[in-house]
């Protein structure tokens, strides 16, 4: 009897040892990511579509954050959670705040601290996914006030993804292509955003779909 109990316990131990834990994913960003965990947000949508036994999704977004803010709070808000994957979605405030409050991030500082965030995560054996900032206005004729800067900062992120061989969710490109097909009136908002920047229902679903494609690649 006792031998049977020991044998059962041993088999149970072996079986649990081979049960893989869900991949823990932290979404690291600004107010768009902060809102992503709310009902109907893109992270909430991902939680409903990705298998819970394969993915654990955690939001780590704070409104107004720029790349330097992410760098400063990495330890408490990301590393302490011991993620397997970190999805970095930042850059819109680094550009937007240049015009709105004069507190944006200059290009050299943006790239330097973005690279520092990547290196810190990789030093902790965390897989990194990069995202380009999506929109500051949805007009399709390149007359949104900060299209030039947003394209430049998106190019910086694409370059970092190439140099570090990282997966990229190119939301800037995806939003531009979607708006070209679905914004015939050349509106500055209301297609994928509520206010030119933050996501509406369709925008959250669109981002969730883009994220899912990258997160499930190879699964």
Give the location of each predicted region:
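Bacterial Sec-dependent signal peptides at the C-terminal "C-region" and cleavage site
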Residues: 1-24
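Alpha-helical cap/lid subdomain in secreted, periplasmic
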Residues: 20, 44-53, 69-219
């Amino acid at each position: 009897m006792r031998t049977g109990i020991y044998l059962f316990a041993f088999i149970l131990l072996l079986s649990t040892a081979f049960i893989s834990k869900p991949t823990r994913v932290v979404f690291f960003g600004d107010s768009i990511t902060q809102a992503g965990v709310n009902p109907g947000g893109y992270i909430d949508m991902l939680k409903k579509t990705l298998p819970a036994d394969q993915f654990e999704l955690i939001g780590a977004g704070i409104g107004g954050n720029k790349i330097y803010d992410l760098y400063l709070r990495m330890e408490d808000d990301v590393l302490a959670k011991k993620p397997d994957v970190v999805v970095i979605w930042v850059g819109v405030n680094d550009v937007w705040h240049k015009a709105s409050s004069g507190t944006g991030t200059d290009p050299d500082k943006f790239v330097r601290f973005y690279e520092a965030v990547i290196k810190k995560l990789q030093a902790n054996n965390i897989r990194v996914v990069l995202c380009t900032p999506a929109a500051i206005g949805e007009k399709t004729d390149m007359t949104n006030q900060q299209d030039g800067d947003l394209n430049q900062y998106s190019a910086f992120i694409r370059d970092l993804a190439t140099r570090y061989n990282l997966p990229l969710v190119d939301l800037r490109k995806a939003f531009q292509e979607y708006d070209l097909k679905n914004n015939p009136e050349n509106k500055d908002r209301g297609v994928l955003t509520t206010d030119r920047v933050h996501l509406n229902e369709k925008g959250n679903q669109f981002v969730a779909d883009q994220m899912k494609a990258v997160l499930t690649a190879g699964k």
